[in-house]
A protein has these predicted regions:
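Active-site cavity-forming subdomains of large catalytic enzyme subunits
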Residues: 1-166, 189-193, 242-262, 288-290, ...
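A glycine-rich phosphate-binding loop feature that marks nucleotide/adenosyl-phosphate handling sites
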Residues: 2-9, 35-37, 56-63, 109-122, ...
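Catalytic or ion-translocation cores adjacent to nucleophile or general acid/base/metal-coordination motifs
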Residues: 15-42, 228-233, 322-341
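Glycine- and acidic
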Residues: 21-26, 74-81, 152-167, 189-199, ...
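Function-dense linear segments that define catalytic or interfacial modules
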Residues: 98-198, 203, 208-218, 317-344, ...
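Catalytic alpha/beta core of large soluble enzyme barrels
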Residues: 132-137, 180-185, 278-282, 291-298, ...
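Internal maturation/activation junctions in enzymes
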Residues: 172-195, 199, 203, 221-308, ...
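Acidic, low-complexity intrinsically disordered tails
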Residues: 452-481
Length: 481
């Protein structure tokens, strides 16, 4: 359920998933998300007041964003229509406390989601999906649908030269785009509004899996400048290939029905809607933009990096865009449980001649960390877990790739010892970077861990599995692609 923070039900909404309190006011199986206008973040930042309204009295607010929303909101404040006025910081703290306790609500920013959308000519987008990567227009006559696929990035790394094959990635992105168009045409639609939406706007969502594995294969630490630059080039290549193929499909079959009036119809692509990046574009975008203006595109939306919680296990990749959470752990999904061991680490430790029971027990004892092993510093950097790196790294990389992501991305954030101050800083930074999804889940580590009574391999592995499974509650497999 998505709600905007001006809604008079917001305070009760924040309590729905809490562990304590009135059971009649709890709904812990409901996934909660905020659809946040920039005005709220500005009021929090400046220490201002925040007004709550009944949706019955302010029926146009859900339809507005940007300056139009601000003008209407402030007019309703002056007219005295607020049901309650409070310090914006008070509501903000309530949101943060809920995230400390439950990992939710998800944080999505209404203005960037609309202002940076190729569907902005259709109307106002009012929500995302369960995994926060789909941002599509929907109304009473149309149910937004997306057609997903993920690309296994490690397949494009040459194991001998440790070079990345960008041209091959462009070619595969074109193939995926072509195939997803066939899915749209041949799919079974359970409802007419779903079929109507999919056929009119033809959105697709291309994501990735194994980004962390790709960095490792190329001898890069996740939090290195080289990895950040690679991330930018990878997503530029995927976006280029998908735009190119969507244009070629439009040549054959015609542009999607609502293409005219979209940003793309005017030669405006996703990266044109963002602030300039520190990294230059490397592909021939000018010529492609002219082709798009001439021939159109077959799809309104193209990229949407999703969680890949289950499908990444098929090829043994780390999921989606995330760092490794541990070098040895149990991954629990709705489809079952998977013991995950970092295969790249084992290979390197074997080559150094130090992979043995003692090393394995040391990794288990340190909850999947290698920072206390006697190994070269470059290996310690390369095999850092997400708990051992700044979350600014994840946000920066999300913003860099966001310039090529025309929907949004499932961006989890991780804090070993969360508090409201740290979370507030992360949210403010993500918002200022222009992200559409500021946070999917806030992942934390359990306070209690299995006591390591023994270094016996079997016993300690079971203990580690039990401890690590606490960190990986049931994952959503709907967006596995």
């Amino acid at each position: 359920v998505y709600i905007e923070p001006w809604n008079s039900d917001i305070e009760a909404f924040m309590d729905l998933r809490l562990n304590q309190g009135d059971e009649e006011a709890r709904c812990r199986d409901l996934f909660s998300a905020l659809w946040i206008p920039d005005l709220f973040m500005e009021r929090v930042q400046e220490g201002g007041k925040w007004s709550l309204f009944s949706p019955d009295d302010t029926k146009d607010l859900p339809e507005l964003y940007g300056d139009a929303f601000k003008e209407a909101y402030e007019r309703y404040e002056k007219e005295g229509k607020a049901t309650k006025t409070m310090d914006a910081h008070v509501l903000w703290q309530r949101i943060l406390r809920s995230q400390v306790e439950t990992g939710t609500p998800y944080m999505l920013y209404k203005d960037p989601c609309n202002e940076k959308s190729n569907q902005k000519n259709l109307g106002t987008i009012k929500c995302s999906n369960l995994c926060t990567e789909i941002v599509e227009y929907t109304d009473k006559d149309e149910t937004a649908v997306c057609n997903l696929a993920s690309i296994a990035l490690p397949k494009f790394v040459n194991p001998k030269t440790k070079k990345f094959n960008y041209q091959s990635l462009i070619d595969v992105s074109r193939t995926v785009t072509r195939n997803l168009n066939k899915v749209i045409d041949r799919n079974f639609y359970p409802t007419e509004p779903a079929r109507k939406s999919n056929m009119r706007h033809r959105p697709i969502g291309i994501g990735v899996q194994g980004l962390a594995d790709t960095y490792i294969l190329m001898d890069m630490a996740f939090d290195s400048e080289e990895a950040r630059a690679l991330n930018h080039k990878i997503f530029e290549a995927i976006y280029y290939g998908s735009v190119l193929e969507s244009m070629e499909e439009a040549k054959k079959y015609g542009a999607y029905e609502t293409f005219e009036g979209s940003p793309a119809s005017k030669g405006i692509l996703q990266f044109d809607m963002w602030e300039p990046s520190k990294y230059p574009l490397t592909l021939n975008w000018d010529a492609l933009k002219e082709d798009v203006k001439t021939h159109g595109m077959r799809n309104s939306l193209l990229l949407a990096p999703m969680p890949t919680a289950s499908t990444s296990q098929i090829l043994g990749n780390n999921e989606c865009i995330e760092p490794y959470t541990s070098n040895m752990y149990l991954r629990r999904t709705l489809a079952g449980e998977f013991v995950v061991i970092n295969k790249h680490l084992i290979k390197e430790l074997i080559s150094l001649g130090i992979w043995n029971n003692e090393t394995k027990n040391a990794i288990i004892r340190d909850n999947g960390s290698v920072q206390n092993l006697v190994i070269p510093d470059e290996l310690k950097a390369k095999y850092k877990t997400v708990w051992e790196m700044s979350q600014k790294v994840l946000i920066d990389q999300a913003a860099d790739r966001g310039r090529f992501v025309c929907q949004s991305q499932s961006l989890n954030l991780f804090l070993e010892d969360p508090n409201t101050s740290k979370i507030s800083s992360m949210h403010m930074y993500a918002w200022k970077q222009g992200l559409k999804t500021g946070m999917y889940y806030l992942r934390t580590r359990p306070k209690a861990r299995a006591v390591q009574f023994t270094v016996d391999p079997a016993t300690s592995l079971e203990a580690a599995k039990a401890a690590c499974s606490l960190e990986n509650k049931d994952e959503c497999t709907m967006c596995s692609a």
